[in-house]
A protein has these predicted regions:
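Glycine-rich phosphate- or other oxyanion-binding loops that anchor nucleotides, phosphorylated ligands
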Residues: 22-29, 54-300
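Short, conserved "active-site rim" segments that organize catalytic pockets and cofactor/ligand binding
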Residues: 27-47, 64, 69
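N-terminal/domain-start segments enriched in small and hydrophobic, helix-friendly residues
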Residues: 50-52
């Protein structure tokens, strides 16, 4: 009998984490996601009625932003972290839409540091294959033929999305929600963006919000002029980061509306001097947060 009691207790102990993995909050909320801590203060400061939950080390903050119910969390840097934490949020909260707010590298020569980009589709620029080198150049090898773009040995291509007994869906671009893009386009002209960090520490231009165009993400920090030019030409991308396409991928599979606001903290290797992220990270984060606040306040 004592042995049976011990076994039951052990089974209950193993079952506890599964039971705890249910919903933590039933209120329909907009998920507002950032990658890492420097992108968070302006959003947290704009959130009232805060309650905190911690799941496997990830902190989720519920509350109200511009009067709308939200849940905020940090995805963590890079693709796997972003996918993992986004799915955690979907599993534990009643997420009605996903909004990403953060900084990124600009690849469109027409854009500058401090500008905010709201891309209409996101792809993964390092999803694909590293090709074998042959006598006549790089050889495609046993890889799907619909190669999207190449940079030397790197061949980017679509991902396969499982569909049960049906053939997998092959997709490179993951779209932002059209209705959310309309809201973004409506509020964008009226949002004041910062040009200066402090007296004497100002950008040479007044930042702007750009709605539309493409963005790409990958598990590398890009600070390389040649690769930046490749991304702009091959993907017709405006912006490059390390998380958004992964979040868009998860949102697409879960049929959850998604949109991302990325403010340029640097030019991904296109800067005239050293990379500017350490100089303009705070300004870019606050510009992105300002647009997100206006966007959330305009939601129905």
């Amino acid at each position: 009998m004592r042995l049976l009691t011990v076994l039951i207790a052990a089974l209950l102990a193993f079952a506890a984490p599964a039971a705890a993995a249910g919903r933590l909050d039933a209120t329909p909320r907009t998920a507002v996601v950032s990658a890492y801590a420097p992108e968070w203060p302006a959003l947290l400061a704009a959130t009232t009625d805060q309650a905190r939950y911690t799941v496997n080390g990830v902190v989720f903050v519920t509350g109200r932003m511009e009067g709308r119910p939200v849940v905020l969390f940090l995805s963590g840097v890079s693709m796997v972290n972003a996918a993992m934490t986004t799915q955690m949020a979907l599993d534990r909260f009643a997420v009605s839409r996903i909004v990403f707010s953060g900084v990124a590298g600009g690849v469109d020569p027409a854009l500058g540091v401090g500008d905010v980009v709201v891309a209409d589709a996101w792809g993964q620029h390092l999803e694909g294959a590293f090709l074998r080198e042959g006598p006549q150049g790089f050889v495609p090898g046993p890889w799907p033929p619909e190669r999207v773009a190449g940079f030397g040995m790197i061949a980017a291509g679509p991902v396969e999305l499982p569909r049960g007994d049906q053939p997998p869906e092959r997709r490179f671009w993951f779209p932002a929600d059209p209705a959310l893009l309309q809201v973004a386009a409506w509020i964008a002209p009226a949002v004041p963006l910062k040009r200066c960090l402090a007296p004497g520490r100002c950008l040479s231009h007044q930042p702007k919000v750009v709605v539309g165009g493409r963005g790409v993400s990958g598990p590398v920090f890009v600070d390389n002029k040649a690769y930046r030019e490749h991304v702009a030409a091959a993907f017709q991308a405006k912006v490059l980061d390390m998380e958004t396409a992964a979040v868009a991928h998860v949102a697409y599979v879960n049929r959850t509306p998604f949109i991302a606001f990325r403010s340029l903290s640097d030019l991904a290797g296109g800067d005239e001097g050293a990379n500017q992220i350490e100089t303009f990270l705070t300004l870019a984060s606050e510009n992105s947060a300002a647009v997100v606040r206006a966007f959330v306040g305009a939601l129905p």
